[in-house]
Amino acid sequence: ISKGLVGSEMCIRDSSIYEPEANNTPDNFSLGEKASWDPSKYFVDDYEDVEIQTEDGVILSGWYMENDPSAITIIGMHGVTSSKFSPDVLLVGGMLYKQGFNYLTFDFRDHGTSTCEDSRHSAGQKEIYDVKASIDWLQNEKNIPTSNIGLYGASFGAMIGLMTPAITNDFQALAVVDSPFDFASLVREELVYQGFPGFLFEPVYHYALIFDQINLTEISPDDGLAASNKQPLIIFNGKQSPRVLAHHTDDLINAAENYGISTEVSRYDDLSHTEVMYAYPVEFELKLVNFFRSNINE
């Protein structure tokens, strides 16, 4: 069973992902197996190591890249078993920074070098409070108004971004890449992908409820959309992903329409999971930058 989906006995790291990325920094990172082209034009020399404390005492390890305190500021959120060292967030940070944005990215709890709280992720139930803490940090430490803040997430980070309005609407726009939309379906599909029967989700769910006192489906992306201020969404989806199936994006688009939320959608028949920024970097950057500039007022 995937450690990333149901937890592990150590902090959540897929060594095949984490170890090759562990030396990445905003000013020098590789794309690893994601792509073979040179990303050096997206390196950011001027960045700050930061620590952000959540309401429940978790310390989040992050990097902050600032152009101008009055500029649009985007929070970048990584995927499960990944970290702020991932090119999924560093490449996008470089794209945005070079276009004049500020950018904050951090390790979710139990990921990277943030506090190893309980060696498990909580399907976003706790991680949304990490996002809230990062928004509060930008306000309190960097004097960034919420009117200038947007969110970007890839995969698990995208799902958490969709869930965030259930506890705070202090941001103006959200960009998501290959987001899961229904966690229960995601786990069942992952179990099948790994060669296990899908019904094993039920004991996993009850284990978390009984032993960790966490309801893994208490807050869902749909709940986040329902509670939102109808912040506009830009949605990117590689339809060939074997892990987060294309129906999750179908469901997201339908839910956003039902709630009257404006969406921009780019779907790619030829791409797999979180590949768009590597396969079509110029197109991706242009769409992302124009979206945030159109929906966040500096």
Indicate residue ranges for each PLM-predicted region:
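Short beta-strand/loop motif that positions the catalytic acidic residue
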Residues: S228-N229, I234-N237, S241
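C-terminal catalytic histidine-bearing segment of alpha/beta-hydrolase fold enzymes
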Residues: D250-E298
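Alpha/beta-hydrolase active-site loop
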Residues: H121-K142
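The serine-hydrolase catalytic nucleophile loop
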Residues: V80-M95, F108, H247-H248
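Conserved alpha/beta-hydrolase
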Residues: G93-T115
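N-terminal cap/lid segment of alpha/beta-hydrolase-fold proteins
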Residues: L31-P69
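Single conserved hydrophobic/aromatic residue that forms the stacking wall/gate
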Residues: I1-G7, C11-I12
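Hydrolase active-site cap/lid region
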Residues: M163-I214
